[in-house]
UniProtKB/Swiss-Prot annotation:
It comes from Methylobacterium radiotolerans (strain ATCC 27329 / DSM 1819 / JCM 2831 / NBRC 15690 / NCIMB 10815 / 0-1). Keywords: ATP-binding, Cytoplasm, DNA damage, DNA recombination, DNA repair, DNA-binding, Nucleotide-binding, SOS response. Can catalyze the hydrolysis of ATP in the presence of single-stranded DNA, the ATP-dependent uptake of single-stranded DNA by duplex DNA, and the ATP-dependent hybridization of homologous single-stranded DNAs. It interacts with LexA causing its activation and leading to its autocatalytic cleavage. NCBIfam families: tigrfam_recA. This is Protein RecA. Gene3D superfamilies: P-loop containing nucleotide triphosphate hydrolases. Coiled coil: none annotated.
Length: 363
């Protein structure tokens, strides 16, 4: 049986009457809801340009595709315990403060260490902090701060600690399923519009739980239901992959961050970097690793060199050399930024998405 041929129908050009009707509708909408409530996409500079805040990690900024975390969006950072979630959020706050931004930290876990935050570069005098008693109180405070339009970065640590008032007032062991998920869903419905209008970045730190009875696929899931997965523009999965030691003493962790979801650039890139105890993200360690990937730093056996100058034997010695020679470190960083496209390609080569990543990214 012969297949019918596909017929391509050309749309007629927009006539003058249609154009007048569109303009009249646009002006009516703007009178009713305010200027900027509707616009042509190509004429809006705000829509085309994505403002970002650095994460404090050069590799992660490159992996995100736009040079950092986007402002005016919801961000989720999740992972196991002691993997570096709060450290990454505090680095982002420090970078925003360096550019004159106002930041807030909603400490639902009541566990923020101000001494450690100061070591990461956070200006504690200008940081707004709240330690709410209930999940409703935490999200009301978040909503008020976002609506003020004066906050640049706001961190909620963590979603798992946003305990509904009914659960706190109830008996220990009393089952109240779905309370936290409904709380998060309602809060995000309210917050999303305010976040976009105020251009405030809201980072939700989240924990991991295990789903019972899962036979196939990953049994891991995040707390607070599915709403955050859908509303988040960027989701970062951070994992500790090894412990860094100086002889027998642990001095830090090597972590891997995967961009599980990204609405502003291609997702599924991953990057590895060191988080040193009492110091945070090791920038000199990243310069060596990314420099090797970009072909800027040469590695021959155990030796690392840059422009025919030896940096040191072994990675730790090379890190020490760059720490003592900030000018050379700045040169390497500049070269890496100029070759960020090549570095991003190398990062993408090493991070093929899994079936679980694809499921998460579709949210």
């Amino acid at each position: 049986m012969a297949q019918p041929a596909l017929k391509v129908v050309d749309m007629p050009p927009v006539d003058k009457d249609k154009s007048k009707a569109i303009d009249a509708a646009l002006s009516q909408i703007e009178r009713a809801f305010g200027k900027g409530s509707i616009m042509r996409l190509g004429k809006s500079d705000k829509v085309q340009e994505v403002e970002t805040v650095s994460t404090g990690s050069l590799g992660l900024d490159i992996a995100l595709g736009v040079g950092g975390l986007p402002r005016g969006r919801v961000i989720e950072i999740y992972g196991p315990e002691s993997s570096g979630k709060t450290t990454l959020a505090l680095h982002t706050i420090a970078e925003a403060q360096k550019k004159g931004g106002v930041c807030a930290f909603v400490d639902a876990e009541h566990a923020l260490d101000p001494v450690y935050a100061r070591k990461l570069g956070v200006n504690l005098d200008d940081l707004l902090i709240s330690q709410p008693d209930t999940g409703e109180q935490a999200l009301e405070i978040t909503d008020t701060l976002v609506r003020s339009g004066a906050i640049d970065v706001l961190v909620v640590d963590s979603v798992a600690a946003l305990t509904p008032r009914a659960e706190i007032e109830g008996e220990m062991g009393e089952s109240q399923p779905g309370l936290q998920a409904r709380l998060m869903s309602q809060a995000l419905r309210k917050l999303t519009g305010s976040i976009s209008r105020s251009n405030c970045m809201v980072i939700f730190i989240n924990q991991i739980r295990m789903k019972i009875g899962v036979m196939y696929g990953s049994p891991e899931t995040t707390t607070g239901g599915n709403a955050l997965k859908f509303y988040a523009s960027v989701r970062l999965d951070i994992r500790r992959i090894s412990t860094l030691k100086d002889r027998d003493e642990a001095i830090g962790n090597q972590v891997r961050v995967k961009v599980v979801k990204n609405k502003v650039a291609p997702p599924f890139k991953q990057v590895e970097f060191d988080i040193m105890f009492g110091e945070g993200v090791s920038k000199v360690g990243e310069l060596i690793d990314l420099g090797v990937k970009a072909g800027i730093v040469e590695k021959s056996g155990a030796w690392f060199s840059y422009n025919s100058q030896r940096l040191g034997q072994g990675r730790e010695n090379s890190k020490g050399f760059l720490r003592d020679n900030p000018k050379i470190a700045a040169e390497i960083e500049g070269s890496i930024r100029q070759n960020s496209g090549l570095v991003a390609e190398k990062i993408l080569e090493n991070a093929a998405p899994t079936a679980d990543d694809l499921d998460e990214g579709e949210a």
